């Protein structure tokens, strides 16, 4: 579907470029080969006005990020959502919320000078891509501090179990959130969709989250101290590394060798985690 656009822009090479970016999006890699356009690292900013490219890339990112077991439920049960595994229900619900709510915030806080349509598609894309995809269609460094903070949270959460995405996973985030709600309401059991989470699942979720938080925060502070850069920017780069996203505020190429080594280490450690069953 992207071939006509890329062939129009790059000739016969557009065939290869459409295949490359499709795989990169579905696998949540975020690599692009468009650096010969306007600058060295444009990502998909040159296609921010192209709704076809935006929608297809977003669909592929989401498709690769919800997990293969979820797709198995969708394929097997179609629209009979009640028959889905509880994990699939949690994944689909959490994914929808993590796309819609941040997109609303981005729409309200950014791109105010743009027409409604472009503003909407930019907001949606920047809401989808932090979940370990790594593409961008806007200058992230020009977005508001609150938007960048939300993007850090989205990167931290990442995709879903059995998917191509990183982060602590949507199910882990959902378990912690449901546990907090249950605590506030003085409920002993943590439940979702009529089923109960066991204590070990909650412990696993807390452990995984704390491990990622320690790596992310320690790495960000270390880079900030060594480079003398603002902590917020360094935390953004650290979150992008440990959650294997690939987004940047533009400071990574300027970092010294030690800071780059820290980011490399965070990338490797970020892939060590527990894609463990969290429900019963």
Indicate where each model-derived feature is located.
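Membrane-proximal intracellular helices of multi-pass ion channels
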Residues: 1-280
């Amino acid at each position: 579907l992207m071939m006509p656009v890329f062939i129009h822009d790059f000739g016969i090479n557009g065939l290869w470029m459409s295949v490359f970016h499709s795989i990169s999006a579905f696998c949540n890699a975020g690599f692009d080969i468009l650096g010969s356009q306007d600058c060295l690292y444009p990502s998909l900013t040159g296609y921010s006005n192209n709704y076809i490219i935006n929608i297809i890339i977003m669909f592929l990112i989401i498709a690769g990020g919800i997990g293969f077991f979820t797709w198995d439920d969708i394929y097997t049960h179609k629209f009979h959502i009640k028959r889905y595994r509880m994990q699939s229900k949690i994944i689909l619900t959490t994914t929808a919320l993590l796309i819609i709510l941040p997109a609303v915030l981005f729409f309200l806080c950014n791109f105010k000078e743009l027409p409604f349509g472009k503003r909407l598609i930019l907001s949606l894309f920047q809401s989808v891509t932090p979940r370990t995809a790594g593409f961008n269609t806007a200058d992230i460094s020009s977005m508001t501090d609150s938007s960048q903070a939300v993007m850090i949270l989205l990167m931290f959460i990442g995709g879903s179990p059995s998917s191509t995405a990183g982060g602590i996973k949507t199910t882990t985030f959902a378990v912690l959130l449901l546990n907090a709600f249950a605590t506030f309401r003085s409920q002993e059991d943590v439940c979702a969709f009529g089923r109960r989470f066991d204590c070990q699942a909650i412990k696993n979720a807390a452990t995984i989250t704390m491990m990622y938080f320690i790596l992310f925060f320690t790495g960000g502070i270390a880079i900030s101290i060594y480079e003398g850069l603002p902590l917020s920017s360094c935390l953004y780069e650290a979150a992008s590394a440990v959650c294997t996203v690939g987004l940047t505020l533009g400071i990574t190429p300027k970092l010294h060798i030690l800071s780059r080594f820290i980011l490399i280490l965070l990338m490797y450690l970020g892939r060590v985690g527990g894609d463990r069953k969290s429900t019963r």
